[in-house]
Amino acid sequence: MVKKVALECSECGRRNYSVPARPNHEERLELKKFCKHCGKVTVHRETR
């Protein structure tokens, strides 16, 4: 089974997306995604 990590909105702190974990990467994933709670596109960071 694939481990999943959550992507947390940098503005409101809600965890809106889950993506497969990247075991060979030390740095955390950052993507610009739409946050339905903020109503705009914000940076979402990987949480562990």
From Swiss-Prot:
SUPFAM superfamilies the record matches: Zn-binding ribosomal proteins (SSF57829)
A GO MF term: structural constituent of ribosome
UniProt xrefs under InterPro entries: Ribosomal_bL33, Ribosomal_bL33_sf, Ribosomal_zn-bd
Family: Belongs to the bacterial ribosomal protein bL33 family.
BP-aspect Gene Ontology terms: translation
CC annotations in GO: cytoplasm; ribonucleoprotein complex; ribosome
Pfam families the UniProt entry points to: Ribosomal_L33 (PF00471)
Name of the protein this chain belongs to: Large ribosomal subunit protein bL33A
Alphabetical UniProt keywords: Ribonucleoprotein, Ribosomal protein
